[in-house]
Amino acid sequence: MKTKKFSNKNKINEMITAKKVKLVDQNSVMIGVVDIEEALSRAKAVNLDLVEIVHDDQYPLCKIFDYSKYRYSHKKKISDSKKKQKTIIVKELKFKLNIGDNDYNVKLNMLRGFIERGDKVKISLRFIGREILHPEVGMEIIERLIRDTADIAKPENLPKKEGNIINMVLTAK
């Protein structure tokens, strides 16, 4: 069975190798430069840990506090910040040049739902066969989409033609 190992970035208690340290007590009062034995005995006297905060060449800065409590609260902060992050998903809707009114309305409702959830929506309008000879009809469909979603969405970039496809990305206002 594997056990999860926590990587300590700070040296604690007997792991500190310096002979003398700058000591800050549990009330954040600077004690000054003391021997490591005295610092360890002060920490043990109040049932707390001696933690090396800043490693300095001459005297490392050490503080007396409950390291396990600090580690727990630090993990909790990290997990809370991960929960609050929202990943933006890019959804894609594909249109054709000869789309019917009902099909257009269904896709428009899907687009509205994606935008209201906070997703970006990539619109792809594909030309098939000789339809490529009439790109202005495709641009009319794209402009109609922009007009119909103007209340909740805005184009992230202008519609651009890449080969036989016109692409555009819509985002929430």
Swiss-Prot record:
Gene3D superfamilies membership: Translation initiation factor 3 (IF-3), C-terminal domain, Translation initiation factor 3 (IF-3), N-terminal domain
Signal peptide: none
Coarse class of the protein's main subcellular location: cytoplasm
Gene Ontology BP terms: ribosome disassembly
GO cellular component terms given for this protein: cytosol; membrane
Family matches, as SUPFAM superfamilies: Translation initiation factor IF3, C-terminal domain, Translation initiation factor IF3, N-terminal domain
Subcellular localization, as worded in the UniProt entry: Cytoplasm
Protein name: Translation initiation factor IF-3
Organism listed in the record: Ehrlichia chaffeensis (strain ATCC CRL-10679 / Arkansas)
The gene coding this protein: infC
